[in-house]
Swiss-Prot record:
An example molecular function term from Gene Ontology annotations: acid-amino acid ligase activity
Pathway the protein acts in: Cofactor biosynthesis; coenzyme A biosynthesis
Family the entry assigns: Belongs to the archaeal phosphopantothenate synthetase family.
Known catalytic reactions: (R)-4-phosphopantoate + beta-alanine + ATP = (R)-4'-phosphopantothenate + AMP + diphosphate + H(+)
Binding site for ATP: R17, R39, D179, L180, N181, R185, T186, N197, L198
Alphabetic keyword roster: ATP-binding, Coenzyme A biosynthesis, Ligase, Nucleotide-binding
Name under which the protein is recorded: 4-phosphopantoate--beta-alanine ligase
Pfam families: PPS_PS
GO BP terms in the entry: coenzyme A biosynthetic process
Length: 253
C-alpha cells in the first residue's frame, strides 16, 4: 500500500482507499467494490467525515439488538474484509455474534481468502464456506449457512445490497445496516440504519458494546422499543444539509 503520512488531514479516508485497492490485488475484494467505496466516500464528505448524532443513536440501538439476540450474525463481504476485519472480530467477540461470509460476486477462492483474512484477525470460526441453506433471491447472496444468517434473529449486514436486506426483513429478522447513503434502498428497508463510515461505526459499536454489556436487560429493551429508524434517516439527511450550509458559509458560496 502507498505510505500515507499520519498527519495528512484525510489520512483515514486515504487509508481506506488503499485497503480496498489492496483487497482487490489480494483477491478479497471485487473490482465493483472499488466503485462502492468511492460512492461511500462521497457521502462521507457530505456528513463531514465524522460520526453524527443520528449515527451514534443508531449504533447504540444496534448494539442493544445484538446483545439481546439469541443468534446474532455479522455478515461480511469483500469490502468489509479488506477495511475492518479486526473490528468485525472484536465486535463479534464482545456481542457473541457469529461471523458469516456472504458475497454477491462469489467464488470459492474469494470465500476462502476472506475466511483466512478474518481468522488472521482472530476469528475462531467463520461460516459461509459450505452454505447449506438458501434465501429466495436469484443471485449468489442467497447462499447462506443454516447455523448463521438463515436462522439468525439479528443480522448486521454492513455495505449491503437492498434486495437481500429486504428479503431478510421479510423473514422477520432485525436487520442492521451500515450505509453512508441515507437515501439508498438498503437504508430505507433496514430495521436499524447506521449512516456512518464502516470503520468508525464498527469501532463505535465495539466501544458501546463493552459498556452496554453491563446494563440491565430492561435498559437494552428500552433502547430497541423507543428506536425510530425513520427519525434516524430524517436526521441524517438534515445533518448533511446543515454540514453543507456550514461549508457554504465558510467558503462564501
Amino acid at each position: 500500500m502507498t505510505d500515507i503520512p499520519h498527519d495528512h488531514p484525510r489520512y483515514e479516508s486515504l487509508l481506506a482507499r488503499e485497503k480496498v485497492a489492496a483487497g482487490v490485488k489480494m483477491g478479497i475484494t471485487s473490482i465493483q467494490g472499488l466503485i462502492a467505496q468511492g460512492r461511500g466516500e462521497s457521502f462521507d464528505y457530505l456528513i463531514g467525515e465524522r460520526s453524527t448524532e443520528s449515527a451514534l443513536y443508531a449504533e447504540r440501538a444496534a448494539v442493544a439488538a445484538l446483545l439481546l439476540a439469541e443468534n446474532p450474525v455479522i455478515s461480511v463481504n469483500g469490502n468489509v474484509a479488506a477495511l475492518a476485519p479486526d473490528k468485525v472480530v472484536t465486535l463479534a467477540d464482545i456481542t457473541g455474534a457469529r461471523i458469516e461470509v456472504n458475497l454477491f460476486h462469489r467464488t470459492d477462492t474469494r470465500v476462502h481468502l476472506i475466511i483466512e483474512q478474518l481468522k488472521a484477525s482472530g476469528a475462531a470460526e467463520v461460516l459461509g464456506k459450505n452454505p447449506d441453506a438458501s434465501l429466495e433471491l436469484s443471485h449468489d447472496r442467497r447462499l447462506v449457512s443454516s447455523k448463521g444468517i438463515y436462522t439468525a434473529d439479528v443480522v448486521l449486514v454492513p455495505l449491503e445490497d437492498g434486495d437481500r436486506c429486504e428479503k431478510l426483513v421479510e423473514m422477520g429478522k432485525t436487520v442492521i445496516t451500515i450505509d453512508l447513503n441515507p437515501l439508498s434502498r438498503t437504508s430505507k428497508t433496514a430495521t436499524i440504519s447506521i449512516v456512518d463510515n464502516l470503520t468508525r461505526a464498527l469501532g463505535n459499536m465495539a466501544k458501546f458494546a463493552q459498556e452496554m454489556k453491563k446494563e440491565r436487560k430492561e435498559e437494552l429493551v428500552k433502547l430497541i422499543t423507543t428506536y425510530d429508524n425513520k427519525r434516524t434517516l430524517s436526521e441524517a439527511i438534515s445533518e448533511i444539509q446543515e454540514h453543507l450550509k456550514t461549508m457554504a458559509a465558510e467558503t462564501g458560496y
